[in-house]
Amino acid sequence: MHNIHRRHFLKAAGAVTAGLVTANIALNANASSVAPKPRVGKSVIGLIAPKMELVRVGFIGVGERGFSHVEQFCHLEGVELKAICDTHQAVIDRAVEHIVKQNRPKPAVYTGNDLSYRELLNRDDIDIVIISTPWEWHAPMAIDTMESGKHAFVEVPLALTVEECWQLVDTAERTQKNCMMMENVNYGREELMVLNMVRQGVFGELLHGEAAYIHELRWQMKEIDHKTGSWRTYWHTKRNGNLYPTHGLGPISQYMNINRGDRFDYLTSMSSPALGRALYAKREFPADHERNQLKYINGDMSTSLIKTVKGRTIMVQHDTTTPRPYSRHNLIQGTNGVFAGFPNRIAVEHGGFGKSYHEWDMDMQKWYDKYDHPLWQRIGKEAEINGGHGGMDFVMLWRMVYCLRNGEALDQDVYDGAAWSVVNILSEQSLNNRSNSVNFPDFTRGAWEHATPLGIVGA
């Protein structure tokens, strides 16, 4: 979707749908103040939608990220691209042109204002909706999608407040519709190989994980009227916490069976000073430029520690400001050894091809030969050709479509999206209370204790 400018950001999406609590309210509400409400439907853990011969897709938002999804869907079998919506005509024209060039029927187009997406939702020939819009629109649009009888697939993060998380859970349970936050990193080749290794016991009993989103993005501040920086920059002036936790946390959560035998219990968080963006603005923009009038409050480095009910620990970091190489950490430690990413390396006590666990084994090929994930073995070449963050985007969308067409449960559900996203809010709450711990809501309402762990998913 056309990146909503500052006036929309400051208005907040609460004006979009009456009764929805959104980005600019309840930012500091304690998680415990939103206790589990009585379930109005039934749990959607393991929800299986009726098989779809064809998956008919609508897209809300076809800008930078949304257009990438359009490109990937054009390479998938068993899908129809029925309609697109955006408030920016140029990105609509680009998406339509691309779809037609791929010898697919021209999609219907909805535009004109911020609520035009509701016209798309009124169609009866759409099964799923891909939502790729600025963050404050994710929850309202996903709720409206499920209320319209369609499955919602939402870009990260899923929600921006604890109340939004509960509204998404309640709506999914009442409508019995999927609401999947599309955490693409869970489908990376390394992440899925490690999931395979974890399930086969290579690392022993899991103890500790480390996750991060360390990605220098100051350059986005130069995106003034369009693109991600035109709205994402302002979040650094509104919140102080982990703004974007899910890329690193998603894979660690699946390794540890979070919401499927374990769950997040509580969190504590700290942030460094917020210096880098003001320094960058001073260096890169005129003194009277709007970027130099902003007060950047989000600490350059946010570090949170999560304790699970089973006693495991997870470190989660966020830094999109300082000059340093990209990393998601992706470290998982067990009683028999450890995997760490960026760069990939392994050390195990038993089963390490003769390598001592006192030294990192950085020769990954033999590990791929033995533990490469079935999904990557099957469609890895297609994924590499079609791209999308090294192929993980293609694998994610392929797997989504496969599950919908074959009557299988999705790999991520609304509870996962809520638990991973709520770190954003809880990290801020902890920081504002001298880093004291904050409890995680149990969005599953106790169902996590008996949920079947995610297996080595395949096809």
Curated annotation (Swiss-Prot):
Family label: Belongs to the Gfo/Idh/MocA family. Glycosyl hydrolase 109 subfamily.
Keyword terms of this UniProt record: Glycosidase, Hydrolase, NAD, Signal
SUPFAM superfamilies the UniProt entry points to: NAD(P)-binding Rossmann-fold domains
The protein's Enzyme Commission number: 3.2.1.-
Protein role: Glycosidase.
UniProt signal peptide: 1-31
NCBIfam families per record: TAT_signal_seq (TIGR01409)
Chain residues that bind NAD(+): 64-65, 86, 135-138, 155-156, 184, 244
Cofactor, how bound (note): Binds 1 NAD(+) per subunit. The NAD(+) cannot dissociate.
Annotated positions binding substrate: 213, 232, 244-247, 326
Annotated transmembrane regions: none
Protein name per UniProt: Glycosyl hydrolase family 109 protein 1
Processing after translation: Predicted to be exported by the Tat system. The position of the signal peptide cleavage has not been experimentally proven.
MF terms (GO), sorted A to Z: hydrolase activity, acting on glycosyl bonds; nucleotide binding
EC top class, as a word: hydrolase
Cofactor: NAD(+)
Organism: Shewanella sp. (strain ANA-3)
